[in-house]
């Protein structure tokens, strides 16, 4: 993988700086929001403060920074007032206050409050530093009133004795020592030196802003363009050293010419100057630490360079050639020290990492390495020939390869050392031999004759075979095996760049994508843990996941969980990464996981106001809003975030998905209660909307509320219909005192059987089937309704008695109902599918409903939310559908009833005999019908005819074969329109006997049976 640029995004390292600076006695601190809407809430608290006070971080967060939870009986009220005044004025404040821990124990605390500003100069945070001074001679816990700052002590000196003065002096001395502690150098072990500003005010704390990378102009960024140009120049110099140093050591050392006259002397000195300058620049060049941070501190840079490459670069930069220039005599072994410069080739490999993704560069590098190896071996081959000549007698020994070369070139050696071929010819011949030996078996024109030469030739052939196989044979396969991860990185990076180019993404978004990819790859090296562990058994995968996620599993929240539960949870935890400035969550987003901060810091924002600052070890998420609902279980439990979560630095996070948590809780129900109780305690900040006021996120849909709401909605749509009742005694029409009964449906009246007509139409409607099911045709009272006083008796006094009165028609006024309410569609029960929700409801009742004006209608729209209105409409539609089904079943029962009535009328006619009136008359005496069906009023009748006082008119309209009964028409009005049921033949039974107790006014009972339409008169 190419060399990392490092984590270059601008970071807000305020939290890390505060934690680093306030170490030791100043590790107890709080951060409060200075722009908060509700009394400067605490947005961060250190672990030292939690240990000092005994409160947990969750208990402290979002409380006011005045720390009222630490107050007690001996806490000075004037000191608290001065603290509040300093907060309101955004001023620095110092005081000694008696606070109380969670267990109730008191302690004296030196409180420092300092405002923190941003880059615009605005006070955005308050920093509170707490120092326990109870053990260092602080004020006695039994002497309340000695609180506050030094001004308060000066005012109280006159009223107190010597002990008070002594304590005040101790406090002043302690303040001076406290300031001296911050100004004396801690790392100076030899001598302690105080700064010149010992008694000056303390230096200001860091600002809450984004820090820039590379604050000094004298620093050279390791990823800048000038640094890249310089690295290229050093690369060429390193190649030059790799070529010239072996050549000068092997060939120039045996030359009698002076070194000062060498052609490469100037270039050698220039390269040495470049190396010396490179050493100087390395002390001012930033580098990337192991954690991925860009280090720009000069001291850290120097220490890092001294510990890594300084000594190698120093030896390579020793000016050996300058010794020759000044005619300083050196031994021949000094020339060998120049070979140490070849160690810079290791730096060369490091520099070439960033260019390794280019195939042309890789090919050039491989060929250069092959040629460089041949060059080095040619130098060694020449040295072997020279040493063979020096070791043997020059007069008798002439079988070396240099002698053979001199003979062929007609430049033989004289006396073993003089003469011979030139240095140039010897180097070319040596390079030719090594290349032919490395690439093949050679041609024999330059061959090895001596034992040393043959041994070297053998080694050259072996190396050549290896290099030939590696470079020209299996180089691609070897590189793929060795650098498969790098190849994957390059392929993904290329795909990412192609994606950016094709979609023309803006430059800021492009930079964010590239940096996120590089940093995440640096963290996990491109290894997908889930893909890697997929083939492992579940037992081993769970153990590995528990080890990788051990930080989040060590929270007290999971302390009550069993090992099996922890293993299941660990399989649903994922590691994520967030760059500075990136939003982890935005307000209103669906919260799909709980996040644990492993490293870095984040801030919680709402309307650009800092609500909390999160650091390592914090848990962010949301509690479970309602009992019985697990996160992610259903659409009704979707949690929305109430604030934005933004990364201040590079953050490493571990996230536990809500869906995975719900699955684990279903597998381990015994842990649900402990998790629900422990989650609010361990959450550093609750992101659930509505968590501030503990309100319900959705409207309750309990059956009781739904029923009440349906009654409210139903009452507004009910329309009053006329009803028929039989008055008792002197009751006037419309003077009923009982409220009308609603229509009873099976699902709303569990006391009634589902198939009962009484349950469908109310108690006022008698059961018609009793007439047929009765063993005798004589009228008998219904036992089911005999004892009920609320409904009229089915069998009143005998018709001939004095107490008997004919039934009367009771109709409400015309203003009570309008024409739409009297539509036959409503009476017949045929509902319009397009207007089902607004269909009026009809009811059978004894008493008409009072007139309801439009202004008295219940207001459902303005008072109900959109969701409530939708639910109400669905419930109304469901009720209408059930009503249609019941009406259809009622039609079938009425049809069956009509057939039974025809049979009964036939039996009555056969038993009572023929009527006593003339044959052309269809009048029959009024017989008491014990099982008369209460009819419904016809929509075209608004009241009884004026001439009728003792009769009742009723017309029953029933859908699908329902009969009609007309009672109360005068003989003159009806004879013209009525047709006798059997006009062609007389009644075989004869006239019916008229009871003696019947009134003088005749009544009409017209019986007409029609088989096609099932209508009877």
Curated annotation (Swiss-Prot):
Low complexity bias spans: 771-786, 806-820
SUPFAM superfamilies recorded: cAMP-binding domain-like, PYP-like sensor domain (PAS domain), Voltage-gated potassium channels
GO biological process, alphabetically ordered: potassium ion transmembrane transport; regulation of membrane potential
Pfam families on file: Ion_trans, PAS_9
GO cellular component: monoatomic ion channel complex; plasma membrane
Membrane topology: Multi-pass membrane protein
Ranges of the Extracellular topological domain: 254-262, 327-334, 386-427, 449-454
Region (cNMP-binding domain): 557-621
Location(s), subcellular: Membrane
Region entry Disordered, spans: 139-170, 690-749, 771-870, 972-1017
Domain PAS: 14-90
Intramembrane segments: 428-448
Record CDD domains: CAP_ED (cd00038), PAS (cd00130)
Designated name of the protein: Voltage-gated delayed rectifier potassium channel KCNH4
Native source species: Rattus norvegicus
Encoding gene per record: Kcnh4
């Amino acid at each position: 993988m190419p060399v990392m640029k490092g984590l270059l995004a601008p970071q807000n390292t305020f939290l890390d700086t505060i934690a680093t600076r306030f170490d030791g006695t100043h590790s107890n601190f709080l951060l409060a929001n200075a722009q908060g809407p509700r009394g400067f809430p605490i947005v961060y608290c250190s672990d030292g403060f939690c240990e000092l006070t005994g409160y947990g971080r969750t208990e402290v967060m979002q409380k006011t920074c005045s720390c009222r939870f630490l107050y007690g009986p001996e806490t000075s009220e004037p000191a608290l007032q001065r603290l509040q005044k300093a907060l309101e004025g955004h001023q620095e404040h110092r005081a000694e206050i008696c606070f109380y821990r969670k267990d109730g124990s008191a302690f004296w605390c030196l409180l420092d409050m300092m405002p923190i500003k941003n880059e615009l100069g605005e006070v955005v945070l308050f920093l509170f530093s707490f120092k326990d001074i109870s053990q260092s001679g602080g004020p006695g816990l039994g002497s309340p009133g000695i609180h506050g700052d030094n001004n308060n002590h000066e005012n109280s000196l006159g009223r107190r004795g010597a002990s008070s003065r002594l304590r005040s002096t101790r406090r002043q001395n302690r303040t001076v020592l406290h300031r001296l502690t911050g100004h004396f150098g801690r790392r100076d072990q030899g001598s302690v030196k105080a700064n010149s500003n010992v008694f000056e005010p303390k230096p200001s704390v860091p600002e809450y802003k984004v820090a820039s990378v590379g604050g000094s102009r004298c620093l050279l960024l390791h990823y800048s363009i000038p640094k890249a140009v310089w690295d290229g120049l050093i690369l060429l110099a390193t190649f030059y050293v790799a070529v010239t140093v072996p050549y000068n050591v092997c060939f120039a050392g045996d030359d009698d010419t002076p070194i000062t006259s060498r052609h490469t002397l100037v270039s050698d000195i220039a390269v040495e100057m470049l190396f010396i300058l490179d050493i100087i620049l390395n002390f001012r060049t930033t580098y990337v630490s192991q954690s991925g941070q860009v280090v720009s501190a000069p001291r850290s840079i120097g220490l890092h360079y001294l510990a890594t490459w300084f000594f190698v670069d120093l030896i390579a930069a020793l000016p050996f050639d300058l010794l020759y220039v000044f005619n300083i005599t050196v031994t021949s072994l000094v020339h060998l020290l120049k070979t140490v410069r070849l160690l810079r080739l290791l730096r060369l490999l490091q520099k070439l990492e960033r260019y390794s993704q280019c195939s042309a560069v890789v090919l050039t590098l491989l060929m250069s390495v092959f040629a460089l190896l041949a060059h080095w071996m040619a130098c060694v081959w020449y040295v072997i020939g020279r040493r063979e000549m020096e070791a043997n007698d020059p007069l008798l020994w002439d079988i070396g390869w240099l002698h053979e070369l001199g003979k062929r070139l007609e430049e033989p050696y004289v006396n073993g050392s003089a003469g011979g071929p030139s240095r140039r010819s010897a180097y070319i011949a040596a390079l030719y031999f090594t290349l032919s030996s490395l690439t093949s078996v050679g041609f024999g024109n330059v061959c090895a004759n001596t034992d040393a030469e043959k041994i070297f030739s053998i080694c050259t052939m072996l190396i050549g075979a290896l290099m030939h196989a590696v470079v020209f044979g299996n180089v691609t396969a070897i590189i793929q095996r060795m650098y498969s991860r790098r190849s994957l990185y390059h392929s993904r990076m290329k795909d990412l760049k192609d994606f950016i180019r094709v979609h023309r993404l803006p430059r800021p978004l492009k930079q964010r994508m590239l940096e996120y990819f590089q940093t995440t790859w640096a963290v996990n090296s491109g290894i997908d843990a889930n893909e890697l562990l997929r083939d492992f058994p579940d037992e081993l995968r769970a153990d590995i996941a528990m080890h990788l996620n051990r930080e989040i599993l060590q929270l007290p929240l999971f302390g009550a969980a069993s090992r099996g539960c922890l293993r299941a949870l660990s399989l649903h935890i994922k590691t994520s990464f967030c760059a500075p400035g990136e939003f982890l969550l935005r307000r209103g987003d669906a919260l799909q996981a709980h996040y644990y901060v492993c490293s870095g810091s984040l801030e919680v924002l709402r309307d650009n106001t800092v609500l909390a600052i999160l650091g390592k070890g914090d848990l962010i998420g949301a509690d479970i809003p309602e009992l019985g609902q697990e996160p992610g279980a259903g659409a009704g439990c979707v949690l929305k975030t109430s604030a934005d979560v933004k990364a201040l630095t590079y953050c490493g996070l571990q996230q536990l998905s809500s869906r995975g948590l719900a699955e684990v809780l279903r597998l381990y129900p015994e842990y649900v209660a402990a998790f629900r109780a422990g989650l609010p305690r361990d959450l550093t900040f609750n992101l659930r909307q509505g968590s501030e006021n503990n309100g319900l996120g959705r409207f309750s849909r309990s059956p009781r509320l739904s029923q009440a709401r349906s009654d409210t909605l139903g009452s507004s749509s009910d329309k009053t219909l006329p009803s028929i009742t039989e008055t008792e005694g002197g009751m006037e029409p419309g003077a009923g005192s009982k409220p009308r009964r609603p229509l009873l449906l099976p699902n709303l009246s569990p006391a009634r059987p589902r198939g009962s007509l009484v349950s469908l139409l109310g108690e006022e409607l008698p059961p018609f089937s009793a007439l047929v099911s009765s063993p005798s045709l004589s009228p008998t009272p219904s036992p089911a309704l005999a004892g009920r006083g609320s409904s009229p008796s089915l069998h009143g006094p005998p018709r001939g008695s004095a107490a008997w009165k004919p039934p009367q028609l009771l109709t409400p006024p015309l203003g009570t109902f309008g024409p739409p309410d009297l539509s036959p569609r409503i009476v017949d029960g045929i509902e319009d599918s397009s207007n089902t929700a607004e269909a009026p409801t009809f009811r059978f009742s004894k008493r008409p409903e009072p007139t309801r004006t439009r202004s008295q209608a219940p207001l459902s729209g303005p008072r109900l939310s959109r969701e409530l209105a939708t639910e109400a409409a669905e419930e109304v539609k469901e009720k209408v559908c059930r009503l249609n089904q019941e009406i259809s079943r009622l039609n079938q029962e009425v049809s069956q009833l009509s057939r039974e009535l025809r049979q009964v009328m036939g039996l009555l006619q056969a038993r009572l005999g023929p009527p006593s009136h003339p044959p052309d008359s269809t009048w029959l005496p009024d017989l008491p019908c014990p099982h008369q069906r209460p009819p419904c009023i016809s929509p075209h009748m608004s009241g009884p005819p004026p001439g009728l006082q003792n009769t009742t008119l009723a017309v029953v309209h029933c859908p699908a074969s329902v009969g009609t009964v007309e009672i109360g028409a005068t003989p003159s009005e009806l004879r013209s329109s009525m047709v006798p049921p059997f006009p062609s033949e007389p009644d075989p039974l004869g006239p019916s006997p008229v009871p003696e107790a019947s009134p003088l006014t005749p009544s009409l009972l017209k019986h007409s049976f029609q088989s096609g339409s099932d209508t009877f008169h």
